[in-house]
Regions:
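Non-catalytic regulatory/interaction regions at protein termini and inter-domain linkers
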Residues: 1-269
């Protein structure tokens, strides 16, 4: 996925059974992304299911519609369903792990109801995985597996929000790879072009200023098996951790620096 493919285009028209993970540190980015995903779905007449924390729902709702009564009407007609993520998660857990039968009843039943309402395709956004990963990665991956199982019998697209910093070296030591493998697509940052510039500069910092960094990056990308669809720049970061692990943290530190000091980047709306 090149820098010319934006997260906006990924979220505007997801295919059935597309399973997307979004990383974010700023709630505003989450609201923009979910607003895009949900808003486009509603405009196309699709049903939308949100399993969301109340504060995030309030922020997302403000981006969707200034007139709250319009959202209330969508909920009455069954085109929009909003569930509390913490309450939903509490209903699913048995001995600390998500239970398949309970998941099928709660989430499968909600997807069934959205489909039966006659609004065409279904889009779902969920935050239960992010709440769960703060205490148990194994339980988080199990919940992702249950979502994936449900997608084999139900036709819907899914966006999962993860409050993770893509430039934190700790998550690059296994967590990000596990999360990526559980999804079809990963949205690592707000600005793909900015990330591409940051990675290009970081490669030059680490591997030398001549033409070798670009050649090395191309070689890494040619041989790196991406766990999910992601921007080339993100794959170039992960590839270094696989092929030259001793330099991975230093590269990520330089990417972080260049991304956050890139004065060519436009301000987010």
């Amino acid at each position: 996925m090149s820098a010319s493919v934006t997260w906006e285009s990924v979220l505007a028209a997801p295919t059935p059974r597309q399973h997307i993970a979004q990383l974010y540190t700023e709630p505003g980015f989450l609201a923009r992304a979910v607003g895009r995903f949900v808003g486009e779905g509603l405009r196309r007449g699709e049903a939308v299911v949100l399993v969301v924390t109340p504060p995030h729902w309030q922020t997302i709702a403000r981006r969707l519609e200034d007139d709250r009564s319009a959202l209330d009407d969508l909920q009455r007609r069954g085109q929009l369903t909003v569930l509390d993520a913490a309450e939903g998660l509490a209903q699913l857990l048995v001995d600390g792990l998500p239970d398949r039968a309970r998941f099928r009843t709660l989430i499968g039943g909600t997807i069934d109801a959205a489909t039966a309402a006659g609004h065409g395709s279904v889009r779902a956004f969920g935050e239960m995985v992010d709440l769960l990963r703060r205490t148990s990665l194994a339980a988080t991956i199990r919940l992702e597996e249950l979502w994936a199982e449900l997608m084999t019998t139900h036709s819907f697209s899914l966006l999962c929000g993860y409050s993770l910093d893509n430039f934190d070296s700790q998550i690059h030591r296994g967590l990000l790879q596990r999360v990526s493998t559980a999804h079809s697509d990963v949205i690592p940052v707000d600005d793909y072009a900015r990330l591409d510039r940051a990675v290009e500069r970081a490669y030059a910092d680490i591997f030398g200023p001549s033409g070798e960094p670009a050649s090395l990056r191309s070689t890494f990308l040619a041989h790196y098996a991406r766990p999910a669809a992601m921007p080339d720049a993100e794959a170039a970061i992960l590839a270094v951790r696989q092929f030259v692990p001793v330099m991975a943290d230093e590269l990520l530190d330089r990417v972080r620096h260049h991304y956050r000091t890139d004065h060519d980047a436009p301000a987010a709306n």
